[in-house]
Amino acid sequence: MGTRQRLIDTASELLAGEGVDAVTLRGIAKAAGVSHGAPLRHFSGRAELLSAVATRGYADLLARREKLPDTSPRERLTAACHSYVDFALANPAMFELMFRRDLIDATDPALSAAASAVFDTFAVLVAAVPTPIARSGADLRLVAASLWAALHGLAQLWLWGGLAGASFAPSPESALAVTLDAYLG
């Protein structure tokens, strides 16, 4: 394995173990066993390195989508939505990084392609489900973006404790079920 890949692997491990704020170039270099200047020989800066890590997160999320059961379109979409929330809850630091435009370079070609692939796959799943919204003639990519935003918000609120402390004490599964019922009818 080359130094560039080792730096990405090490940054991913630090991210998972210690969170976004702990992932510094110097800390990555130390944990990877390379000189403190090595990251800048392989990346233009922290944003480029973190973009490579976030790209890996999108690839992992896409891999989950490719493993969806071969069932009805509605069941596949429901499984994809559960997979998204499960990914967020199982990988909170990666989930945070993937959407932190202050830490990553959203114009990075690999990151942009990976994020687009995840959304495009999701949009295809949404378009395949005959819902009242779809029958109304709504732009299905906009519907997909709206459902994604709802899923993302649900996951983020759960991670931040915004729903966990609610007086009615929902579980992620029950909140997701209500969200899906609202979108899918």
Predicted regions located by residue number:
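Amphipathic alpha-helical segments used for helix-helix packing
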Residues: 89-106, 156-164
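Amphipathic alpha-helical packing segments from all-alpha helical-bundle domains
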Residues: 106-133, 141-146, 170-181
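Amphipathic C-terminal alpha-helical segment
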Residues: 128, 148-166, 181-185
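Hydrophobic alpha-helical connector segments
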Residues: 52, 66-94, 119, 137-147
